[in-house]
Amino acid sequence: RLISGMVRGIGAEYYSMGMSPAISHERFHEAHDLVIQAWTKEGPFAFEGKHYHFEYVNVWPRPFQNPHPPIWCPSQGSLETIEWAADPDHKYTYLQTYSPFEAVKKFLHMYRDVARDKFGYEAQDSQLGWAAPIYIGETDEKAIEEARPHMEAFFNKFLRMTPEMLLPPGYLSLRSYKNVMKHKGGLSKVRSMED
């Protein structure tokens, strides 16, 4: 048994593979379709897509869950990802990642609004998630004191990227870029995550 997390990746990952970030959505959707077919279609079969070509696809053993394992979509707030996850053909769990609580609430409300207003159904609580760093200490103060240097290193060193590498031109639609900046104000800071 498993829960699958399907992520599009970030702009820098496409650059490192010599690919345009502007095609990240179509590559992601095609890869999703390939994985779903591999999980649900009797093999072997050939897959011929625009970006992926396989003469022989045959997953064995097949997943235990039917029709396939649950899929969660981690995201930083791309409107296209929210709409794709909420689509009635999917109804995948939307997982907001590394965001302050107020931004999480806004993006999860957006998922509910899209499900209701665009697709005509009420999103269930099980379709909404928040991936937040958690550290447990003897007291809240001790936990913050012990965790802060590690979280600061994670956000300020390991995830430190210039905007053009993190969100290069074409990676987000203009409406998603404006939405992320409006609700998150750029990259999350450690202090805003402590609440």
Tell where the protein language model's regions lie, with residue ranges.
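A conserved active-site cap/scaffold subdomain adjacent to cofactor or substrate pockets
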Residues: G77-L108
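A general structural motif
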Residues: C73-S78, L166
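Acidic/polar active-site rim loop that often engages polyanionic ligands
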Residues: V7-M19
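Short, solvent-exposed loop/turn segments at secondary-structure junctions
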Residues: G11, Y52, S78-L79, S99-P100, ...
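Hydrophobic faces of well-ordered beta-strands that scaffold small-molecule active sites
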Residues: L2-M6, I71-P74, H90-L95, S126-A132
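A local structural motif
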Residues: N66-P70
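An alpha-helical appendage that flanks or caps ligand/catalytic pockets
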Residues: I23-R62, E102-D195
